[in-house]
Design a protein with these regions (language model features):
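Sec-dependent N-terminal signal peptides
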Residues: 2-12
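PEST-like low-complexity, intrinsically disordered acidic/proline/serine-rich tracts
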Residues: 15-234
């Protein structure tokens, strides 16, 4: 299933910002920050439903895989919700987002999105933006829930062992914690890293890697484009 954000016009935000400053971003700018910016990348991943130990994964072994909840949404927005309907085969690919949800621009865009989508009180904007997180967070957003057929704790353990971020040619940094949360038929995986001095860098690239066994991701982000209001935002 292709998510709605991949149909939007391609415009990477980061090095170049819209004329209007926050909080006067329009809906298009909000969605671009959340889904196609210096802090967020869309990626199509191939799903290999073969265990690395002998045997294949059977669709009937996955709780809830054959029948979706009756009240599931038909489209996936940049903050949540999934498709619905009877699933007859395991998906062969998935469209996911790899992003830095703790970066201030994403927190601001998320707050604006929620206020407009959920009809919340605009006076709660600063409350919704919140304070910076203790950890630097990389999020894998929109992962098919079937991957967690053995439970989210298994996914957390697998990602904790495999994930890294690497700044330039420096030694890869491993996460201190992983949080996997199911949302109907999708799952969001948050990978938490200590904020070592490398996270304040302003040059080079940072490469994100994670292996979930059914698929793996490797994505580079350019630190020079991740500057916002005079500082690195990760």
């Amino acid at each position: 299933m292709r998510f709605v954000w991949f149909a939007m016009a391609s415009l990477t935000l980061g090095a170049e910002w819209p004329e209007k400053a926050f909080p006067d971003w329009n809906d298009d700018t909000v969605r671009k920050v959340l889904t196609d910016s210096a802090w967020s990348r869309g990626k199509t991943v191939k799903l290999e439903w073969v265990k690395r130990d002998p045997g294949n994964i059977n669709l009937r072994d996955i709780p809830g895989a054959l029948h979706a909840p009756a009240n599931a949404n038909q489209s996936l927005g940049p903050l949540g919700g999934i498709g619905r309907g009877k699933k007859e085969t395991l998906p062969s690919k998935a469209d996911i987002l790899i992003r830095w949800p703790g970066a201030l621009p994403l927190r601001q865009a998320t707050a604006l999105y929620r206020i407009r989508e959920e009809k919340l009180d605009p006076n709660k904007l600063n409350e919704l933006i919140g304070a910076p997180e203790k950890y630097a967070v990389v999020e894998l957003f929109g992962v098919p829930a079937e991957i967690a057929h053995q439970g989210t704790s298994v996914i957390e353990s697998i990602v904790l062992r495999s994930a890294t971020v690497q700044f330039g040619n420096a030694k890869p940094i491993r996460p201190v914690k992983v949080e996997a949360k199911l949302q109907a038929l999708t799952m969001n995986v948050r990978i938490l890293f200590d904020r070592t001095p490398e996270f304040s860098a302003k040059s080079a690239d940072v490469e994100v890697y994670a292996d979930l066994q059914i698929f793996s991701v490797r994505e580079k982000f350019r630190l020079s484009q991740m500057q916002y209001r005079g500082r690195s935002e990760l």
